[in-house]
């Protein structure tokens, strides 16, 4: 085991000098004793002359030149398997929930090759989420990849928590949650939410939160993914939740300049597409088992063309776009039904009825969008009878796309609703065909199934 010395410390980036004949490989883990703390460094570059450039997986406060550094001769390894269920771990797989050792039987390196092309499998099976707008407009595939896109404060985390609650309770498999650069409070809420709904023993939690150094945030997604891969390779259907994939990119941006790379567009790292690809190519389903992943993607300044969200789009099967405009109308979940897409929305996969209903809803909403300008200038009276009907139905559909969430009961005061796909299709089809033209539009706001809207109308 070779030993080197620290020669330079700049923030999270540490340069270490080793003997010329014992230089560590790229991605090898190094260990340094920083006071009472054990700090792990990960090799990023070999600079020549026996010097390697590393990223610290923890705070580099108190590090100084001349400290001894040990080469562990392998990449960062984390515990995998059933021992991780119900536990909260950090980027190195160390427990942070004060419940003692993990007691794992096996450790895996966080850097692994993606499955080969022959091993990949393609599933057309749908995953019902119980959220009307998602099941109808952008259905999820079992073993598929879903992105929740949205700016600050439009409900990415709440939507993600509702999905976890619905899927983890309805779906009996294992889940892995990777909190990448998000708020510690949300991590805490999430843990208690899981404990209260008795699913904590089926979830492994890995956190690298906002207050942690960029090294932790850059690698914690890989830690969570490695745990999910182990469950998949045991032949299970596993769910992987990542909140938030943008912070993974951002952590790379933070260390990119310190690593001596030239920034590219908008100041992102030049290796943005490659780093995203390395992560996304591993989140995949094989012939042995599947990984269904839901990833929250922060959209800087609500600009979907920003390089970071734009790079993520290419890897996904379904995109759920949350819109500030819809949130400002008080419609939650604030999913934009015209902007959200799914590869599964195909008559061969979802069936003709579902496909026609979804496309019908889109065309009514699209027409309403076009008529809005006319209404704003001339008022409703100038519209033709046909257009007035379209507007009335569109406003009902818009309100019917809202739904009370289980995880938001505390804020809304109304009990959460799980709506089956069958009921969702029936409800929207009925509105489009004019069965509910006589009901006031308020009746459709924040209800579950169409029967509830009819009941609500009686009380109005």
Swiss-Prot record:
Its EC number is 7.1.2.2. It is found in: Cell inner membrane. Keywords: ATP synthesis, ATP-binding, Cell inner membrane, Cell membrane, CF(1), Hydrogen ion transport, Ion transport, Membrane, Nucleotide-binding, Translocase, Transport. GO terms for molecular function: ATP binding; ATP hydrolysis activity; proton-transporting ATP synthase activity, rotational mechanism; proton-transporting ATPase activity, rotational mechanism. The keyword Transmembrane helix does not apply. It is a peripheral membrane protein. GO terms for cellular component: membrane; plasma membrane; proton-transporting ATP synthase complex. Changing residue 157 to A/C: Impairs ATPase activity. F-type ATPases have 2 components, CF(1) - the catalytic core - and CF(0) - the membrane proton channel. CF(1) has five subunits: alpha(3), beta(3), gamma(1), delta(1), epsilon(1). CF(0) has three main subunits: a(1), b(2) and c(9-12). The alpha and beta chains form an alternating ring which encloses part of the gamma chain. CF(1) is attached to CF(0) by a central stalk formed by the gamma and epsilon chains, while a peripheral stalk is formed by the delta and b chains. HAMAP family: ATP_synth_beta_bact. Belongs to the ATPase alpha/beta chains family. This is ATP synthase subunit beta.
């Amino acid at each position: 085991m070779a030993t080197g010395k620290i020669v330079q410390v700049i923030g999270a980036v540490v340069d270490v000098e080793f003997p010329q004949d014992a230089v560590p490989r790229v991605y090898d883990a190094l260990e340094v004793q920083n006071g009472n703390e054990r700090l792990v460094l990960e090799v990023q570059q070999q600079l020549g002359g026996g010097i390697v450039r590393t990223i610290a997986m923890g705070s580099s406060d108190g590090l100084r030149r001349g400290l001894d550094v040990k080469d562990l001769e392998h990449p960062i390894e984390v515990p995998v398997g059933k021992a991780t269920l119900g536990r909260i771990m950090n980027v190195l797989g160390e427990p942070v929930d004060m419940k003692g050792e993990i007691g794992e039987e096996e450790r895996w390196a966080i850097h692994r090759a993606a499955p080969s092309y022959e091993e990949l499998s393609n599933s057309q099976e749908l995953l019902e989420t119980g959220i009307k707008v998602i099941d109808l407009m952008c259905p999820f595939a079992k073993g598929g990849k879903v992105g929740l896109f949205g700016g600050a404060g439009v409900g990415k985390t709440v939507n993600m928590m509702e999905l976890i609650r619905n899927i983890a309770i309805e779906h009996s498999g294992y889940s892995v949650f990777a909190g990448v650069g998000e708020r510690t409070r949300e991590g805490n809420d999430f843990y208690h939410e899981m404990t209260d709904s008795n699913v904590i023993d089926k979830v492994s939690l890995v956190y690298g939160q906002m207050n942690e150094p960029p090294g932790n945030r850059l690698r914690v997604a890989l830690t969570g993914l490695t745990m999910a891969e182990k469950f998949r390779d045991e032949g299970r259907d596993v769910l992987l939740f990542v909140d938030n994939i943008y912070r993974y990119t951002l952590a790379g941006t933070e260390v990119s300049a310190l690593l001596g790379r030239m920034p590219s567009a908008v100041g992102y790292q030049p290796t943005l597409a490659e780093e995203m690809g390395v992560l996304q190519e591993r989140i995949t389903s094989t012939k042995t088992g599947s990984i269904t992943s839901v990833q929250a993607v922060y959209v800087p300044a609500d600009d979907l063309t920003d390089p970071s969200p734009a790079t993520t789009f290419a890897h996904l099967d379904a995109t759920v776009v949350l819109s500030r405009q819809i949130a400002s109308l008080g419609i939650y979940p604030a999913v934009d039904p015209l902007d959200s897409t799914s590869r599964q929305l195909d008559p061969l996969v979802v069936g003709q009825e579902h496909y026609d209903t979804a496309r019908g809803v889109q065309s009514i909403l699209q027409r309403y969008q076009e008529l809005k300008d006319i209404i704003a200038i001339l008022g409703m009276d100038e519209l033709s009878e046909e257009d007035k009907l379209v507007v009335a139905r569109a406003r009902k559909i818009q309100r019917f796309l809202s739904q009370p969430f289980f995880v938001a009961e505390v804020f809304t005061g109304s009990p959460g609703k799980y709506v089956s796909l069958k009921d969702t299709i029936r409800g929207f089809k009925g509105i489009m065909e004019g069965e509910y033209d006589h009901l006031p539009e308020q009746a459709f706001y924040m209800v579950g199934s169409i029967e509830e809207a009819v009941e609500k109308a009686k009380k109005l």
